[in-house]
Regions:
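Rossmann-like S-adenosyl-L-methionine
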Residues: 1-115
Length: 115
């Protein structure tokens, strides 16, 4: 609801917001003839454990032009990026973001595009 309200307040009418389990939605949307839209850009911000293999498989199957992956865990980030790179994506930029100063935690925002 907040995303929709923010879009309306800013007169953004070219975005669609979906509230669902990411793995379930991506798997359903990746099916041929699902009737669900294949997005141009996929944003992933999984928990510390990283994305599920099924969700990453679905992202690769949908072949969006770009993927933005936000991660708080370098190990799972490396694992998931390796899979995306093997499936036709190139890492364009990785930007660490210190959201928790004076701790050893850092978020990384990764921009990928299809080769």
């Amino acid at each position: 609801r907040n995303a929709c309200a923010n879009a309306a307040a800013n007169k953004i009418n070219n975005a669609r917001f979906i509230c669902a389990d990411a793995t379930d939605w991506m798997r359903a949307a990746a099916q041929p003839n699902s009737g669900l839209p294949h997005p141009d850009v996929v944003f992933l911000d999984p928990p510390r454990e990283g994305s599920t293999p099924a969700c990453i498989d679905a992202v690769a199957a949908m072949k969006p032009k770009r993927v933005v992956y936000v991660s708080c865990n370098p190990e799972t980030l490396a694992r998931d990026l390796m899979f995306l790179v093997r499936n036709g994506y190139k890492v364009k930029k990785i930007q660490p973001v210190d959201m928790f100063p004076h701790t050893n935690h850092v978020e990384c925002v990764c921009a990928l595009s299809r080769r």
